[in-house]
């Protein structure tokens, strides 16, 4: 089984996340995409952010019964600072002989540029393949793959494009829209929208 790790705060998960994960499955050829929500200490949560419990619950609601999506909660359970090295080791040990080839690490273009500076990069980077999701194309930007190639010229490892449809939305935009009473409901799956409303999330 070919597995891809897709980490993030998912505060909240939105359609852009799901489109990228779907592209990793359909175009990059991975059998399952594991959404890995990062832990945020209750003492360090930003005002207006959702709790770890709410973020995990929204992820489960978002993926529903999609057979090639799963939620991996190891960073939430571990607590503290989330290090990719520990997550890669945990997933490799958890799936063991079921794994086919290397794990994939799904990244956005901006995050990919900073990867060589991540904690213990040399200890885990050779154990993963990198799949890069495009950010939205702007006027004069060129195509997604062409632009990403230029952006990641100095990236020290081979990578492939997820060939995803990149939507110009973000979790930050959604939180701000909720706080300011703007339209946001169609940027997230309907079960997530209903959960946010029922729980009164992001209003402060």
From Swiss-Prot:
EC number(s) stated in the UniProt entry for this protein: 2.7.7.18
Keywords of the record: ATP-binding, NAD, Nucleotide-binding, Nucleotidyltransferase, Pyridine nucleotide biosynthesis, Transferase
SUPFAM superfamilies the UniProt entry points to: Nucleotidylyl transferase (SSF52374)
KW Nucleotide-binding (keyword) present: yes
Biological process per Gene Ontology, one example term: NAD biosynthetic process
Reaction it catalyzes: nicotinate beta-D-ribonucleotide + ATP + H(+) = deamido-NAD(+) + diphosphate
MF (Gene Ontology): ATP binding; nicotinate-nucleotide adenylyltransferase activity
Top enzyme class: transferase
Full protein name: Probable nicotinate-nucleotide adenylyltransferase
